[in-house]
């Protein structure tokens, strides 16, 4: 009696794995800023986030959009690239809104003797007062659980998006414009972390930063890089070279995120 061994199509398996990792990355990036937006709202301040961090990141988003346009990607992927710009801009505007609100509060009290001795700079960086929201009542483990569920849903949606865009994907074509835009955006994404690390070091604190924000960024970058690496391209070397800026950009930012995690541990008893 002969036993027929099951046949495995490794190319299909790797393609499905690549799609799953890409969807997981997409799921993380779609909800990435929600924890930090909630943290800022709770504190009524965004002074824990470096302006330069977000501005450089936003410029990187613009080059990412340029790469998407010149790369002839599907309209869905292009819309997601614009979504990243909108979400990052929202976080940046939230920070400046709280600064404007704090400046108005200081200006309205300038006639009070005690407040006359305070500088405007102190007023701008002072939180207006914490807001109690449902997110704040959850433990850190529960917050991770909630965001995990949201990421799962986003991953499922992301898988559908990637599946719809797969027919437009070229696995081994190198286009100069997307490659150049990818190089620039990867460098910007890497450099964006540096002002935040310096800010944390000077303040000797990570208070007001959401650790979930950086966890999602790390998972998103890791899964994104491996989604590229495991894809069974017909010309793997040329394919890898064409995607090298995004691979190096993803892995390099992970190392800086790890250092930020170290800062969370180092400064956790400072506040």
Curated annotation (Swiss-Prot):
Alphabetic keyword roster: Amino-acid transport, Membrane, Phosphoprotein, Repeat, Transmembrane, Transmembrane helix, Transport, Vacuole
SMART domains registered for this protein in UniProt: CTNS
Disruption phenotype: Increases vacuolar arginine levels and decreases vacuolar lysine and histidine levels.
Catalytic activity: L-histidine(out) + L-arginine(in) = L-histidine(in) + L-arginine(out)
Gene Ontology terms, MF aspect: basic amino acid transmembrane transporter activity
Origin: domain of life: Eukaryota
Pfam families referenced in this protein's UniProt entry, alphabetically: PQ-loop (PF04193)
Transmembrane region(s): 17-37, 49-69, 77-97, 144-164, 178-198, 211-231, 245-265
Ranges for domain PQ-loop: 14-80, 185-239
Recorded topology in the membrane: Multi-pass membrane protein
Any one Gene Ontology BP term: basic amino acid transport
PTM-bearing positions, type Phosphoserine: 119
Predominant localisation class: membrane
Protein localization: Vacuole membrane
Substitution effect: residue 35 to A: Impairs activity
GO cellular component, one term: membrane
Keyword set includes rRNA-binding: no
UniProt family annotation: Belongs to the laat-1 family.
Protein purpose: Amino acid transporter that moves basic amino acids across the vacuolar membrane. Appears to function as an arginine/histidine antiporter.
Protein name, entry field: Vacuolar arginine/histidine antiporter stm1
Lineage: Eukaryota, Fungi, Dikarya, Ascomycota, Taphrinomycotina
Gene behind this protein: stm1
């Amino acid at each position: 009696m002969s036993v027929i061994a099951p046949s495995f199509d490794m190319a299909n398996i790797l393609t499905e794995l690549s799609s799953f990792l890409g969807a997981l990355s997409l799921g993380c990036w779609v909800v990435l800023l929600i924890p930090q937006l909630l943290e800022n709202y709770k504190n009524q301040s965004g002074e824990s986030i470096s302006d330069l961090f977000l501005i450089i990141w936003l410029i990187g988003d613009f080059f990412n959009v340029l790469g998407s346009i010149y790369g002839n990607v599907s309209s869905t992927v292009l819309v997601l690239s614009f979504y990243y710009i909108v979400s990052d801009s929202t976080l940046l505007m939230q920070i400046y809104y709280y600064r404007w609100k704090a400046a108005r509060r200081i200006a309205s009290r300038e006639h009070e003797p005690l407040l006359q001795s305070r500088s405007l700079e102190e007023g701008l960086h002072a939180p207006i007062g914490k807001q109690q929201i449902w997110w704040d009542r959850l433990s850190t483990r529960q917050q991770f659980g909630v965001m995990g569920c949201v990421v799962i849903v986003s991953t499922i949606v992301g898988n559908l998006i990637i599946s719809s865009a797969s027919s437009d994907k070229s696995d081994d074509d190198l286009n100069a414009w997307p490659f150049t835009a990818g190089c620039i955006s990867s460098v910007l994404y890497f450099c964006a972390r540096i002002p935040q690390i310096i800010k944390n070091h000077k303040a000797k604190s990570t208070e007001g930063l959401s650790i979930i924000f950086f966890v999602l960024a790390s998972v998103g970058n890791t899964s994104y890089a491996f989604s590229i690496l495991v894809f069974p391209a017909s010309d793997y070397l040329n394919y890898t070279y064409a995607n090298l800026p995004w691979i190096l950009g993803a892995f390099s930012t992970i190392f800086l995120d790890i250092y930020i995690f170290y800062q969370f541990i180092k400064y956790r008893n400072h506040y």
